[in-house]
A protein has these predicted regions:
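Terminal low-complexity/charged segments
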Residues: 1-158
């Protein structure tokens, strides 16, 4: 098998299976595949990857690209990592949940809500994570434009 044959096969299969819903697919190095998916197709793509043996969701990484927010979903077969990017407009940031495919995504998706202000459709109600329940709900610490605003009864030096 060629050095990147497995990775190229995964990339091609993703493109073939999902057509125009997958873009910017690439193999940048051994054991790594990257692709961007249309937001609405995220759960379907993740279900397909799981069925193909990528049945461990290693983590989810949120991002802020200015006009867009989103997340990378990193799934693995314990050798190769497939990194799926889904983005959403900053003005109305919404991503579909992948909990029906990967129940372990719960804390990762709650983190997208707390830290980036992304609404995750299908996320069940529950406690905030990782921020405390009394943290202001209109502040998103991992957005590039976030500025800490201390509560009225506190200062930054406290």
């Amino acid at each position: 098998m060629g050095e990147l044959e497995k990775e190229e096969r995964i990339k091609s299969a993703l493109e073939k299976q999902f057509g125009g819903a997958v873009s910017n697919a690439s193999v940048q190095r051994r054991n790594r595949v990257w692709a961007e998916v249309e937001t609405a197709k995220l759960p379907e793509v993740m279900a397909w990857l799981k069925a193909e043996g990528f049945n461990h969701l290693a983590t989810v990484s949120g991002f802020d690209e200015g006009e867009n927010l989103g997340a990378y979903y990193h799934t693995t077969d314990f050798k190769t990592v497939v990194n799926i990017k889904a983005k959403t407009p900053r003005a109305n940031p919404v991503l579909p949940s992948v909990l029906s495919v990967f129940p372990g995504a719960l804390s990762y998706e709650r983190e997208l809500v707390d830290m980036f202000g992304i609404k995750v459709q299908g996320l069940p109600p529950g406690r905030r994570y990782p921020l405390p329940d009394d943290f202001p709900t209109d502040q998103y610490p991992l957005r590039k434009d976030w500025k800490f605003v201390p509560p009225a009864n506190e200062t930054e030096a406290d």
